[in-house]
C-alpha cells in the first residue's frame, strides 16, 4: 500500500461551501461540570446508541492538501462501521468497511485494499491522519478515552484534548441538533498540529 494521494480524493470543492455555510450555536450560561446530573444523563443516553447513521460534509485541511467530500457514516455495532465518501455529484470516491481485525477500502476505480488498521491504511493511501478509532465516539458527543474535556451550559460536550499515537488532538463542538433525542452534534472541528478536520452532520438516523 505504497500509493499516496490517489484519485479517490480528486474531489470538487463545492462541499466546502456546505461547511462554510453551517451555523454555529453557542449556548449561553455557565458550563456544567463533569459530575453534573445533566452530563451523566446525556452521556448514558449517548452510550446506549449502538446503531446509527449520519450524513454530511467533510473537509481535511493540511499544509500538503485540501480534501472536501460528502460523507455517510453507518455504525452497525461498537466495532463495525462503514464510511462512504462521495463527490458533490454523487459519485462514490471511497468506500471503507471496518470489522474486528480487518478493514477493506475500495476506491473510485474499484481497486480494493485490505489492512488490519484503517487509520494506517488511510494515512498510507491518502496522506491523511484521521483518528478513526476515536472518531466514532467523538461524532456522538462522547469523549471516549479523553479525560481532559469541557461541557457547555446544557451538559453537552464542548471541547476535548486527547493524545493519540503521540499526537495531541483538540476537538471543538460548534453546534448540536436539538431535534434529535438525545441531542447529537451538528458541527465539530478537530485539530492536530497543522492538520484540521471539519465535520458537518446534516442528519442523523437512529
Swiss-Prot record:
CDD domains: LolB. The keyword 4Fe-4S does not apply. A lipid is attached at residue 22 (N-palmitoyl cysteine). GO terms for biological process: lipoprotein localization to outer membrane; protein transport. GO terms for cellular component: cell outer membrane. Keywords: Cell outer membrane, Chaperone, Lipoprotein, Membrane, Palmitate, Protein transport, Signal, Transport. A lipid is attached at residue 22 (S-diacylglycerol cysteine). Residues 1-21 form the signal peptide. The keyword Protein transport applies. It is a lipid-anchor. Pfam families: LolB. It is found in: Cell outer membrane. HAMAP family: LolB. NCBIfam families: lolB. Plays a critical role in the incorporation of lipoproteins in the outer membrane after they are released by the LolA protein. Monomer. Belongs to the LolB family. This is Outer-membrane lipoprotein LolB. It comes from Sodalis glossinidius (strain morsitans). The gene is lolB.
Amino acid at each position: 500500500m505504497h500509493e499516496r494521494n490517489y484519485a479517490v480524493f480528486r474531489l470538487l470543492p463545492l462541499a466546502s461551501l456546505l461547511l462554510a455555510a453551517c451555523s454555529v450555536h453557542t449556548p449561553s450560561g455557565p458550563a456544567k461540570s463533569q459530575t453534573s446530573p445533566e452530563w451523566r444523563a446525556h452521556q448514558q443516553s449517548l452510550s446506549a446508541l449502538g446503531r446509527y447513521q449520519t450524513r454530511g460534509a467533510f473537509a481535511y485541511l493540511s499544509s500538503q492538501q485540501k480534501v472536501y467530500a460528502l460523507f455517510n457514516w453507518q455504525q452497525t455495532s461498537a466495532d463495525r462501521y462503514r464510511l462512504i465518501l462521495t463527490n458533490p455529484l454523487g459519485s462514490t470516491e471511497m468506500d471503507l468497511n471496518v470489522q474486528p481485525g480487518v478493514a477493506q477500502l475500495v476506491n473510485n476505480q474499484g481497486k480494493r485494499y485490505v489492512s488490519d488498521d484503517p487509520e494506517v491504511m488511510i494515512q498510507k493511501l491518502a496522506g491523511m491522519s484521521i483518528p478513526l478509532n476515536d472518531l466514532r465516539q467523538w461524532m456522538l458527543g462522547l469523549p471516549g478515552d479523553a479525560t481532559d474535556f469541557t461541557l457547555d451550559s446544557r451538559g453537552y460536550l464542548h471541547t476535548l484534548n486527547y493524545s493519540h499515537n503521540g499526537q495531541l488532538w483538540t476537538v471543538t463542538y460548534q453546534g448540536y441538533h436539538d431535534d434529535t433525542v438525545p441531542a447529537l452534534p451538528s458541527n465539530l472541528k478537530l485539530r492536530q498540529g497543522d492538520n484540521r478536520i471539519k465535520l458537518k452532520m446534516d442528519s442523523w438516523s437512529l
